[in-house]
Amino acid sequence: MGRALVSMVLGATAAATLLIVALWISSEVLITRTYPIAPEVAQAAPAHAVAEGRRLSKLYGCTSCHGADLQGKVYNPNPRLVRNYAPNLTLAAARYSDEQLAQAIRQGVRPSDGRALWGMPAQTLMHLTSEELAMVLAFVRSHSPAGASTPPESAGWRARWAVLTGALDEPRRVARAQATPAMDLGPKLAAGRHIASTVCSECHGSDLGGDDVEGGPDLRAVGAYDAQAFDTLMRTGVPPGGRHLGIMTLVARSDFKVFTQAEVAALYAYLSARAEWLTAAD
């Protein structure tokens, strides 16, 4: 009986070990796979590009991940998920052309080999206009190469499982976002829709209907805000009632403070109209 039990335990241990190895190898194949890279055309930057590029880099979260000096930093230190190192952009700018940087930003792939840039919100940044992208790149190139290269990212078990199940599939998020864009409510609300697509969709989903991965709710909730309450939310992260909204509160205080009054007004006009349309359609 004792020998049989030992054999069973050893057999189960061996089977579990083989399963773990198989899952690790399978996830590594998916993580290191390469993707086709579409050509990008870079636009010449306007005269005011660096100053506006600095503001846009803050608004789009570039400096939140890559650091105020753009020299890179750890932005997800959880070893069970993914230890992400946002790369040193001052070194990347010296190595890549504007067209290649545009490929990384809009397609979420590394120009040198076509591998996925894990954590790069290309599904949101793909909406940048050529002029917006040119200004961001002008700001990046205003920094001389400095600092060290960041270490490669390290995927933990939770991330590997998410890759195997399809929950994490970075480049394909771009295709999914293209297939499910934010609702088009006409030219008068186009400016607000563009802001929602380039800023809000990272956490709230490409169609703004909520995102299970990032945790952002359906922005239909904006229908409960008046213009003043929404302005307060965007600038302080505090909703009516004073609740702490987690990452929304943090991002509003760190990044959204650079929104112009016109941008907040345009965003509110679009999101409130979207909420009204969805309510009427129910």
Predicted regions and their residues:
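Sec-exported extracytoplasmic/periplasmic mature domains
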Residues: 58-61, 67, 94, 106-110, ...
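C-terminal functional regions that serve as terminal interaction/effector modules
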Residues: 225-281
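Solvent-exposed, polar/charged alpha-helical surfaces in well-ordered, non-transmembrane soluble domains
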Residues: 51, 55, 87, 99, ...
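Sequence/structural segment immediately N-terminal to covalent heme-attachment motifs in c-type
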Residues: 46-78, 165-173, 184-208
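Post-cleavage N-terminal segment of exported redox proteins
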Residues: 1-48, 104-113, 131-187, 237-240, ...
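Disulfide-stabilized extracellular ectodomain repeats and their linkers
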Residues: 62, 86, 117, 197-200, ...
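Gly/Gly-Pro-rich "capping" loops immediately C-terminal to redox-active cysteine motifs
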Residues: 43, 54, 68-102, 117-129, ...
